[in-house]
UniProtKB/Swiss-Prot annotation:
Pfam families: Ribosomal_L1 (PF00687)
Subunit record text: Part of the 50S ribosomal subunit.
Single biological process term from Gene Ontology: translation
UniProt xrefs under CDD domains: Ribosomal_L1 (cd00403)
Keyword line: Repressor, Ribonucleoprotein, Ribosomal protein, RNA-binding, rRNA-binding, Translation regulation, tRNA-binding
Function, as annotated: Binds directly to 23S rRNA. The L1 stalk is quite mobile in the ribosome, and is involved in E site tRNA release. Protein L1 is also a translational repressor protein, it controls the translation of the L11 operon by binding to its mRNA.
GO cellular component: large ribosomal subunit
Name of the protein in question: Large ribosomal subunit protein uL1
Naturally occurring in which organism (per UniProt): Streptococcus suis (strain 98HAH33)
Keyword Protein transport appears in the UniProt entry: no
Family in the record: Belongs to the universal ribosomal protein uL1 family.
Gene it is expressed from: rplA
GO molecular function: rRNA binding; structural constituent of ribosome; tRNA binding
Length: 229
């Protein structure tokens, strides 16, 4: 713990908490101040001036990052018949029906993404209390309720991320790993920023993005100038 605190203090000394860094500066600083002993994740956070209690100001969706996430996702698909075979051929890790429901209700959660064909949602709905709080419930807005299961599996395996504004209007997203080249992290960051900018609700008032920051696992938040994106 003492060593971690020392590393954290050292990282804080390199960051000016009053400054808005350009995206290039922020990415370089995030990599430089990372002290985790593993290939840490790089995440961004957007504090949005929205009221998620209003249906027209809820922000949720999915996108495929141009350079992937550096993470291998374990994909579970609820499908039957030909669609189940398509999912398997596309590389899904787990494919099934009621058998998977029983397994998940028994406490098994060794997967990162859940995809379902529309006809399977009545079955998947029984898992709402388990999948919902973990943001794993299939949803048409994130492309995880679809008949094109092959495409959904391939995208999930190839760098697709989902995002959702929480009750405070904060959206967090993974944009890569510390081991990524800085230019690839910058490209992913800019791609996600474009999505966030386009997601601005028409009814949102005032400054839409009140703050944007980047951090690594166990790292320090670095404020980013939205205009540099």
């Amino acid at each position: 713990m003492a060593k971690k605190s020392k590393n954290l203090r050292a990282a804080l000394e390199k960051i000016d908490s009053t400054k808005l860094y350009s995206v290039e500066e922020a990415v370089a600083l995030a990599k430089k101040t990372n002290f985790a002993k593993f290939d840490a994740s790089v995440e961004v956070a957007y504090n949005l001036n929205i009221d998620v209690r209003k249906a027209d100001q809820q922000i949720r969706g999915a996108m495929v990052l141009p350079n992937g996430t550096g993470k291998t996702s374990r994909v579970l698909v609820f499908a039957r018949g030909a669609k189940a075979e398509e999912a398997k051929a596309a590389g899904a890790d787990f494919v099934g029906e009621d058998d998977l429901v029983a397994k998940i209700n028994g406490g098994w959660l060794d997967f990162d993404v859940v995809i379902a064909t529309p006809d399977m949602m009545a079955v998947v709905g029984r898992l709402g209390r388990v999948l919902g709080p973990r943001n794993l419930m299939p949803n048409p807005k994130t492309g995880t309720v679809t008949m094109d299961v092959a495409k959904a599996v391939e995208e999930s395996k190839g760098g697709k991320i989902t995002y959702r504004a929480d009750k405070a209007g904060i959206v967090q997203a993974l944009i890569g790993k510390v081991s990524f080249d800085a230019d690839k992290l910058v490209e992913n960051f800019k791609a996600f920023h474009d999505v966030m900018a386009k997601a601005k609700p028409a009814t949102a008032k005032g400054t839409y993005m009140t703050s944007v920051s980047i951090t690594t696992t166990q790292g320090v938040g670095i404020k980013v100038d939205p205009n540099s994106l």
